[in-house]
């Protein structure tokens, strides 16, 4: 898991200064330490799938990022993942939050990236409530919000990977 609050594809939350963006931080073993780059050759772990759930920070503060810059950053991240795990490795690109343009931006990147096994899942704004019921610190989904996202995501992952669905309660 690579996660960092406030980071975006081409613009961080509340800032137009493009520093420490997620495509840059992707290869870091230790957060914000560029001297500790991760290497696929040194790791025995190979994920079955990569899920990208980015973009809300790029649209934060009701600022809309430049489409070309966003596409370039997103393609850079997709290319890094494919370079690490190969063309056959599946990547599911999801859109967080109620941003219609983010949906369009990510869908455009996925549809035009020219890479195999890159999928798009754009969910509606009401995947979780925009209230304390489903959100925690910094407008990030809390346990309840993440559970709702997981329930929407599970069928897509099962289809992409060929995994069967099990009749069990997801907690």
Outline where the language-model segments fall.
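Aromatic/hydrophobic pocket-lining residues that form the small-molecule binding cavity
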Residues: 70, 74, 146
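Hydrophobic alpha-helix feature that most strongly marks membrane-spanning transmembrane helices
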Residues: 55, 79-86, 111-114, 158
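Conserved, well-ordered alpha-helix/loop/beta-strand core segments that scaffold catalytic motifs
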Residues: 51-53, 78-80, 84, 91-93, ...
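Conserved SGNH/GDSL esterase-like catalytic core that processes O-acyl groups on lipids
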Residues: 1-68, 97-103, 136, 140
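Generic structural signal for well-ordered alpha-helices
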Residues: 74-81, 106-107
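Loop/turn elements at helix/coil->beta-strand transitions in domains of secreted/extracellular proteins
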Residues: 45-50, 86-91, 114-119, 160
